[in-house]
Each structure stands twice: as C-alpha cells, then as structure tokens.
C-alpha cells in the first residue's frame, strides 16, 4: 500500500445519503477476490442514468468523493472499497460512515474522513460553482480544501498512522518479522507449527 500524505484531484459533490454497500457495488459483482477490475461495477445501477454525476465530463478522473451522511452502511464488503479505489478514488469525506466500511477502507488505502454536514454543504457548493475543480486533501494537517473553502476532517489516530506509513495488514505484520522469526526459533520444536505456503 502506498503512503498517503496529500491528494490533489477532481472532487465530486455526491449529494446522496444512506448509501449502502449494495449501492456502491451490487452483490452480482462479488464473485472475484482480486482487488482490481471493479471500476465498472462502482455505483452500477446509478451509472445507467446518463445524468448521474460520475457520468458528467467535469468529474471524470475524480479522486475525492464528498458524500452525504451514512456512507457505506449495510453488509461488510471489501469489494465496495476495492470498487472505489479501482475507479480512482483515494478519499471519501462524509458526515458519517458505517464503522465496518471505515475499517475496511483504512486497510485498503482509502481515506475516510468525517466532516460536519455544514462543511459538506460548503464543499458541495464550492465544487458545484466550478465543476471539475481540484480538491486538496492533506492527511498530515487533516484538512480538505476546494477553492477558498477549507474544512477539517476527523480520522482515528491509528488509521491515520497506517495511511501515512502505507501499512496494510501484511506490511504491518512484516514490521515484526525479526521478532516473529526469533519467537519461532526459540519455540520448542515438538509444538505444532504452521508451514510456509509454497507458491
């Protein structure tokens, strides 16, 4: 997972609330366990509407999604995060996230920052005044800036640290590789052990 500090990219004013994971990626697309190839599945039903915001030219190549409250509710689907990342999003800002979606996001390198509903309105207004405008999201400062509008967002310290360091679950484990090896070497040989996977 790459380190996350600052993202500069097109922002989307996603004026929808209560967006569940089935709306983010319908269950019919959950047949694979790879992390890529899901960009076409993102918001699949809504993208059939030519007027849907992600179909508008100004928002092509967007990396920042400013959503309404209660984003990512419903079932736990890592695929929802994979679809957002595969489409190109690095950041989702919302007044409220489902806890399990937020947890899945941080582990996959998607920043989910909590903003107030008032700040969401301010960001939406700035984006809609200049469709295609670039947003700057600074994880170090915990700020999002669109034009003259700058807001602060909240993110838990642990997830913020993992994103700044670029640590997914495997990389986090590998930080302790020496200690793990020392433990395994000192452990009695007669005890059960896990054999390495041969690829």
From Swiss-Prot:
Q: Which GO terms describe its biological process?
A: L-leucine biosynthetic process
Q: What class of enzyme is it?
A: lyase
Q: Which reaction does it catalyse?
A: (2R,3S)-3-isopropylmalate = (2S)-2-isopropylmalate
Report the GO terms under cellular component: 3-isopropylmalate dehydratase complex
User: What EC number(s) has UniProt assigned to this enzyme?
Assistant: 4.2.1.33
Keywords in alphabetical order, please.
Answer: Amino-acid biosynthesis, Branched-chain amino acid biosynthesis, Leucine biosynthesis, Lyase
Q: In which pathway does it act?
A: Amino-acid biosynthesis; L-leucine biosynthesis; L-leucine from 3-methyl-2-oxobutanoate: step 2/4
| Any GO MF annotation of the entry | 3-isopropylmalate dehydratase activity
Return the InterPro entries for the record.
3-IsopropMal_deHydase_ssu (IPR004431), Aconitase/3IPM_dehydase_swvl (IPR015928), AconitaseA/IPMdHydase_ssu_swvl (IPR000573), IPMI_Swivel (IPR033940), LeuD (IPR050075)
Q: Which domain of life is it from?
A: Bacteria
Which purpose does this protein serve, as stated in its record? Catalyzes the isomerization between 2-isopropylmalate and 3-isopropylmalate, via the formation of 2-isopropylmaleate.
- Protein family per UniProt: Belongs to the LeuD family. LeuD type 1 subfamily.
User: How does the record describe its quaternary structure?
Assistant: Heterodimer of LeuC and LeuD.
Alphabetized PANTHER family for the sequence: 3-ISOPROPYLMALATE DEHYDRATASE SMALL SUBUNIT (PTHR43345:SF5), 3-ISOPROPYLMALATE DEHYDRATASE SMALL SUBUNIT 2-RELATED-RELATED (PTHR43345)
Query: What is the protein name stated in its UniProt record?
Result: 3-isopropylmalate dehydratase small subunit
Q: What is the organism of origin for this protein? A: Leifsonia xyli subsp. xyli (strain CTCB07)
């Amino acid at each position: 997972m790459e380190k996350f500090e600052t993202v500069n990219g097109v922002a989307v004013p996603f004026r929808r609330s209560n967006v569940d994971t089935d709306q983010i990626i319908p269950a019919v697309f959950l047949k694979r366990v790879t992390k890529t190839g899901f960009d076409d599945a993102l918001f699949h039903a809504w993208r059939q509407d030519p007027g849907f915001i992600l179909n508008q030219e100004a928002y092509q190549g967007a990396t920042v999604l400013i959503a309404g409250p209660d984003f990512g509710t419903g079932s736990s689907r890592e695929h929802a995060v994979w679809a957002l990342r595969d489409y190109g999003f690095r950041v989702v800002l919302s007044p409220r996230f489902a806890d399990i979606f937020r947890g899945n996001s941080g582990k996959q390198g998607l920043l989910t920052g909590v903003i107030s509903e008032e700040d969401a309105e301010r960001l939406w207004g700035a984006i809609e005044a200049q469709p295609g405008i670039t947003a700057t999201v600074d994880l170090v400062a915990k700020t999002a800036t669109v034009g003259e509008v700058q807001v602060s967002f909240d993110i838990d310290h642990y997830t913020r640290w993992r994103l700044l360091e670029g640590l997914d679950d495997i990389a986090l484990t590998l930080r302790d590789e020496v200690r793990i090896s020392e433990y395994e070497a000192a452990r009695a040989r007669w005890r059960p052990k896990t054999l390495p996977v041969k690829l």
